[in-house]
Amino acid sequence: MQNSIIKNILNKISQKYPKIDTILLFGSALSSDWTEESDIDLYFIGKDLSDGRIDLIIDSIKVEIQTDNFNDLKTYIEDESGKLLNRNVSTMLATSEILKTESKEQIENLITLAKKTLKTPVDYTTEDVKMWKYSVNDYLEKSIKDVERGNIAAFYFDAHFVIQNATELILATNNHYFPQPKNLTHILEIISPEFLKNIEGYELATNLNDKLLSLQKIAKFCNLK
């Protein structure tokens, strides 16, 4: 349920942009833990709009508005079907709340399509699996050399690529697309708790040697896939 601050800002936006066909609310403003330090995210959709962005500050609250038209949004959502990464448009629409619309059937069809797209299985090949494993091992070797040389900055980036490629491998082979980070932990708890434990071990480690040990466990786990 929207609090009074959000409601007041949404009323001001409706008055400022009375001719917008459809307005969707998504993101943190739909959550009960929204605070005044959070943003308000909106989608303006209309036949004459194009892909764009409007940034506002209203009553000291940051408002971020995406703009687009129905036809292009439909294309974006269809293109996200089966993707491991970047199902962003589908996520925004599938989790949104309709604040206003003069095109009820069109927007409801788009939201339904977005929800279906989020459920599509991940498209990947055996070559993709080989490349993920290769990248994990390659960046692990680089990370080992970084530790030997005491190159902390290089280790940071190489370790990141180990974790990124490993996570993509685990998600794809368990038929999950890469969600927003805040939703990733819950998915990993279900599909691969041991992998999640190694990720958390890496983050909690206080020195490079312990972090490297966690990376090696991550790589070993991936090579078993």
Model-derived segments and spans:
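Short, exposed beta-strand "edge-strand" segments with a Pro/Gly-rich flavor and a Y/T-containing core
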Residues: S50, L56-D68, T95-T101, A172-P179, ...
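Conserved nucleotidyltransferase catalytic core and NTase-mimicking acidic/glycine-rich helix/loop elements
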Residues: L118-K225
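Polar/charged alpha-helical tracts
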Residues: K7-N11, Q15-K16, T75, E105-T112, ...
